[in-house]
From Swiss-Prot:
Belongs to the SDHAF2 family. It is found in: Mitochondrion matrix. This is Succinate dehydrogenase assembly factor 2, mitochondrial. PANTHER family: PROTEIN EMI5 HOMOLOG, MITOCHONDRIAL, SUCCINATE DEHYDROGENASE ASSEMBLY FACTOR 2, MITOCHONDRIAL. Residues 1-14 form a transit peptide. GO terms for biological process: mitochondrial electron transport, succinate to ubiquinone; mitochondrial respiratory chain complex II assembly; protein-FAD linkage; tricarboxylic acid cycle. The keyword Mitochondrion applies. InterPro entries: SDH, SDH_sf, SDHAF2. Its main location: mitochondrion. HAMAP family: SDHAF2 (MF_03057).
Amino acid sequence: MASFCLSRCCALRGSTAVGWSLRTIGTSRVSLAGEGERPPPMIDLEDKSLPIPIYKEKHNEPLKLQKSRLLYQSRKRGMLENGLLLSTFAAKYLESLDARQTKLYDTLINMPTNDWDIFYWATGVKPTPQEYDNEIMNMLKEHVKNANKEKRLCQPALY
């Protein structure tokens, strides 16, 4: 892949890679479309061939343990945007949630198979499906609005 990108980049620039820094090559924009062709559109499709494990609800989990797990899962999302939104939300609200609300939060962050869906629902880009449209989602949407203009450049400290 690197040789393809390098040779394609050199061919487009009409040059060789000798003397170029990796930074120059890495930041150059290479179009995979031919001359006069439009680039392929970006389509948000789920790959049905990849099996996604179904979330198994943890029965009889003590509330304190559940909140500890949810704090960890809120911080380790795999995408920066949700990591920041959910970790700051959890730091602010998780301790004060009762058992029912904690279960709703657990369902919200673990049942959707695509983290981008959670982000789009919370930011209002996509409508929230009925099964996730509850008081916790409303709290998250208000948190995302950031009415107090809090700085959220990194995840809050754990303790």
